Amino acid sequence: GATVVAGGLPAKARNSGAKIASSSVLLFLDADVVLPVDFLEQTFYEMQARALDITSCFITPRSKLRLDKFLHHFANYYMRMTQKFHPHIPGSCIFVKSTLHKTISGFDESLFMAEDHDYLKRAKKMGKFGYLKSYKIPVSVRRLSEEGRIKIALKYIAVELHLLFIGEIRKNIFEYKFGRHFKS
């Protein structure tokens, strides 16, 4: 049984869900994620076996286009290479112990973008992080298709440069749209 909670930007929606959750592990998923059949069982087992407090999977596109595969492979490589000094976590799939979520006061709702990376940065200071090896999470390429692959790649590069040299993103300075496809 699922409960629908008030949404908003991702940080607010995730925090709203976490407030009513009763599990010892929270799982935050994007609305368009389609999980493989035994995904939850295998990933939860791996999280426990490796004693991870916060984790995620690398990503794979739900697309057969070579460019999509390359872009997602590059994103995974970048996440792997920067995890020690500038950690990233795909917001499409985040597992976290509920105690850790509470300890770091959840997601920062004042951030417009990259709230997931900020969340991981704070969580890593208090708990053990690692990427899961058992699965890559299949993610939608809808945004790539709609906005254009080069345009969105350049936008993500601009976001990264902003995070590295200026800081958190608290306004929609990159014309990034959320939740357009799931309005009722």
Identify the function of each model-found stretch.
Residues 5-21:
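Glycine-rich, basic loop-to-helix element that forms the pyrophosphate-binding segment
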Residues 30-34:
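The conserved acidic donor/metal-binding loop of glycosyltransferases
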Residues 113-119:
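Acidic donor-binding loop at a coil-to-helix junction in glycosyltransferase catalytic cores
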Residues 26:
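Short aromatic/hydrophobic "clamp" motif used to bind/position activated sugar donors
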Residues 56-91:
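Short, flexible, basic/aromatic active-site loop/helix in glycosyltransferases
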